[in-house]
Amino acid sequence: MTDAIETRSSHACFGGTVGFFTHQSVETKTPMNFSVFTPPQAKDGKVPGLVYLAGLTCTEETFMIKAGAQQLAAELGLALICPDTSPRGAGIEGEDESWDFGTAAGFYLDATQAPWSTNYRMYSYITQELPALLAAHYPAVDMDRLGVFGHSMGGHGALTIHLKNPDLFKTVSAFAPIAAPMRCPWGNKAFSNYLGPDQESWKAYDASELVASRGTGPAILIDQGLADGFLEQELHPHHFEAACAAAGRDVTVRRHAGYDHGYYFIASFMEDHLRHHATGL
């Protein structure tokens, strides 16, 4: 991992700081962007950190601008870390042709198929390179108290990454996650291209498959809007609920009439998610 990071901008926010950064990634072999909200408590000691994984078409800016999380994070003393959703500018033919695959659609996995396998390594980026970057540049973030949460594709990422790395990310929650990607068009498109035709390999990145062998762990919180246009075809929270029940894993899926898939929905329930993580960390 390269130690150099470039500060693109920095802004005072609720007594803390929001910063936007770029660094050269070893995992993706491209520049990678991320943002960090550092709460005021970080001036006096270590604070827990929450890594937020955004969804399709989003960037490291989306959550910081739209989610409205900073005020409560400042009160609770939580650092917020938001990586980008994929490599950018890898130069792979076809990576910019559709909104649900390639650029801004890295699916938080390590691709095994050419030409994607060289750059599309978001799983290793989130679980290895980003924590090392935080440890090197943000000593106030307590690396023993990290949580992960996300939205849609990022909810899929949060669930799978926590299930596979419970000692790294000790708490988890999700907004409208792609909870059973092997059963939906988004997941099938991504997995078949990034991972190849062998569906056994897909199970390593499907939360509804992973939880069967990882039943123990902290409670999982999921919020889902019932006016979400992607609910029936793409998200399938009921499959994850059933898998958790079979595995004995504590999960709460809250369904909300009238709420859609966007950031008005996320902002409406952000407080509950931040408090969920603050309690667990």
Set out the residue ranges of the language-model regions.
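Non-catalytic cap/lid and distal C-terminal segments of serine-dependent acyl enzymes
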Residues: 2-281
